């Protein structure tokens, strides 16, 4: 699609796994026309796309099965705005790191839309899920409450990547140390990614509004 010419952009949510309904609701409340996307022809009709959480290796297989992987790769390469949360962040990375990959698990094939290295499940497994309040660049009216579930973090970013939020280790993922805290939200051009799930915080659509504004400006 071409540039966004209306105040109400059409934003899709990749409807293969994760909190699809929650993302759709948050986008609608943020001023977008939100649509689920499962087919290439649906992808072609949106100005931007949300890649929700889930399991990144399974999502890669589902993208292949629904014949969406190549069309999505092409749209991202052409500059389509995108927002990935949790597993969606992993899929948008340039490099994926995983210390716990099992031998029979196929590797994640990331799209390389953001120049970053992301470590899968870095904060731990399901029992290590946690919540934190974060200062989020570009979002006003106080900190963002963030829900982390088997969350990744960003090990490193390229020069063109803006860090939007970080969280101190606080005992999570203590097998890897970093003095400056963990990067958990980034942006490169019109592509945004968070390690946490903003769609799970009812009544706070500020991160989604930030993405909708990004789509409008693209």
UniProtKB/Swiss-Prot annotation:
Which chemical reaction does it catalyze? aldehydo-D-ribose 5-phosphate + D-glyceraldehyde 3-phosphate + L-glutamine = pyridoxal 5'-phosphate + L-glutamate + phosphate + 3 H2O + H(+); L-glutamine + H2O = L-glutamate + NH4(+)
Associated pathway? Cofactor biosynthesis; pyridoxal 5'-phosphate biosynthesis
Q: Which InterPro entries match?
A: Class_I_gatase-like, PdxT/SNO, PdxT/SNO_CS
Q: What biological processes does GO assign it?
A: glutamine catabolic process; pyridoxal phosphate biosynthetic process; pyridoxine metabolic process
Indicate which residues the UniProt annotation says bind L-glutamine.
Answer: 54-56, 120, 149-150
EC numbers, comma separated: 4.3.3.6, 3.5.1.2
Where on the tree of life does the source sit, at the highest rank?
Bacteria
Q: Which CDD domains match?
A: GATase1_PB
Residues of the active site: 86 (nucleophile), 197 (charge relay system), 199 (charge relay system)
Q: Which GO terms describe its molecular function?
A: glutaminase activity; pyridoxal 5'-phosphate synthase (glutamine hydrolysing) activity
Q: Which GO terms describe its cellular component?
A: cytosol; glutaminase complex
- PANTHER family documented for this protein: PYRIDOXAL 5'-PHOSPHATE SYNTHASE SUBUNIT SNO, PYRIDOXAL 5'-PHOSPHATE SYNTHASE SUBUNIT SNO1-RELATED
Q: Which NCBIfam families does this one have?
A: PLP_synth_Pdx2
The free-text function statement in the UniProt record for this protein reads:
Catalyzes the hydrolysis of glutamine to glutamate and ammonia as part of the biosynthesis of pyridoxal 5'-phosphate. The resulting ammonia molecule is channeled to the active site of PdxS.
- Family that this chain belongs to: Belongs to the glutaminase PdxT/SNO family.
> Which HAMAP family does the record associate with it?
PdxT
Give the record's subunit note.
In the presence of PdxS, forms a dodecamer of heterodimers. Only shows activity in the heterodimer.
This chain's protein is named Pyridoxal 5'-phosphate synthase subunit PdxT
Q: Which organism is it from?
A: Saccharopolyspora erythraea (strain ATCC 11635 / DSM 40517 / JCM 4748 / NBRC 13426 / NCIMB 8594 / NRRL 2338)
Gene coding for it: pdxT
């Amino acid at each position: 699609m071409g540039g966004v010419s209306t105040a109400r952009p059409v934003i899709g949510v990749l409807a293969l796994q994760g909190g699809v309904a929650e993302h759709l609701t948050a986008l609608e409340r943020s001023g977008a026309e939100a649509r689920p996307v499962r087919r290439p022809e649906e992808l072609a009709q949106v100005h931007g796309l949300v890649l929700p959480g889930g399991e990144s290796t399974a999502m890669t297989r589902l993208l292949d099965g629904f014949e969406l992987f190549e069309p999505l790769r092409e749209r991202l390469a052409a500059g389509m705005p995108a927002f990935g949360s949790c597993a969606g962040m992993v899929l948008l990375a340039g490099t994926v790191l995983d210390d716990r990959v099992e031998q029979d698990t196929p590797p994640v094939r990331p799209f390389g839309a953001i120049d970053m290295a992301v470590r899968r499940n870095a904060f731990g497994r399901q029992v290590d899920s946690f919540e934190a309040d974060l200062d989020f660049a570009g979002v006003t009216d106080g900190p963002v409450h963030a829900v982390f579930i088997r969350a990744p973090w960003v090990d490193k970013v390229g020069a063109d990547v803006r860090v939007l939020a970080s969280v101190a280790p606080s005992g999570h993922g203590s097998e890897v140390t970093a003095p400056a805290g963990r990067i958990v939200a980034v942006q490169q051009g019109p592509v945004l990614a968070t390690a946490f799930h903003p769609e799970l915080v009812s009544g706070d659509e500020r991160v989604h509004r930030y993405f909708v504004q990004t789509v409008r400006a693209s």
